[in-house]
């Protein structure tokens, strides 16, 4: 595996998140319904847009991402963001899964008033993202300010017919979390 510095890896990961989750049209690529992009086309379009991108750099980002944000297709010809999409091009068909008793959501304290009114909503994304452990939720919340960890009564939600899915990187997904299922 080629050597890249942390800034280059972080910048490339952010770029991939942007085009594979939110704005593929920004560089002229099209994602299929499952979020897959042809790697050769991605590299070509990224380079045309002035972004240094190679297969070796992609391999390193995919292999070293602590959150496993990206995955390759079984034939190695396509790449996708595992979850977190806001683009209407993508509707990944995750398998429904029974959640553990509790899941966790990390947020910033400045968002609590709104959450107390409307619960957790997906916003521009397709799903609300939840963690199986508090440590991961804390890291997520810290990205946006002073972190607050909310406990989600996931099994209670599932018993009421609210579906959950789990992305291949372990992130739990659901469409919304009503206030009644949150513990502060």
Swiss-Prot record:
SUPFAM superfamilies on file: ADP-ribosylation
GO BP: tRNA splicing, via endonucleolytic cleavage and ligation
Keyword annotations of the record: NAD, Transferase
GO molecular function, one term: tRNA 2'-phosphotransferase activity
Database matches in Gene3D superfamilies: 3.20.170.30, RNA 2'-phosphotransferase, Tpt1/KptA family, N-terminal domain (1.10.10.970)
Listed EC numbers: 2.7.1.-
Membership in a protein family: Belongs to the KptA/TPT1 family.
Described function: Removes the 2'-phosphate from RNA via an intermediate in which the phosphate is ADP-ribosylated by NAD followed by a presumed transesterification to release the RNA and generate ADP-ribose 1''-2''-cyclic phosphate (APPR>P). May function as an ADP-ribosylase.
Name the record gives this protein: Probable RNA 2'-phosphotransferase
Organism, as annotated: Escherichia coli (strain 55989 / EAEC)
Lineage: Bacteria, Pseudomonadati, Pseudomonadota, Gammaproteobacteria, Enterobacterales
């Amino acid at each position: 595996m080629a050597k890249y510095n942390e800034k280059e890896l972080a910048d490339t990961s952010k770029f991939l998140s942007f085009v594979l989750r939110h704005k593929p049209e920004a560089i002229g690529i099209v994602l299929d319904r499952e979020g897959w992009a042809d790697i050769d086309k991605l590299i070509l379009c990224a380079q045309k847009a002035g972004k240094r991108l190679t297969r070796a750099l992609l391999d390193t980002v995919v292999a070293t991402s602590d959150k496993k944000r990206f995955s390759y297709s079984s034939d190695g010809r396509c790449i996708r963001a595992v979850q977190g999409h806001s683009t209407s091009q993508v509707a990944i068909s995750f398998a429904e899964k029974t959640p553990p008793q509790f899941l966790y959501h990390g947020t910033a304290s400045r968002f609590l008033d709104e959450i107390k009114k409307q619960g957790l909503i997906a916003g521009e994304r397709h799903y609300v993202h939840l963690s199986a452990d508090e440590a991961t939720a804390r890291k997520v919340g810290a990205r946006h300010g002073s972190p607050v960890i909310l406990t989600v009564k996931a099994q209670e939600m599932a018993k009421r017919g609210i579906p959950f899915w789990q992305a291949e990187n372990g992130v739990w997904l659901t469409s919304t979390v009503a206030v009644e299922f949150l513990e502060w």
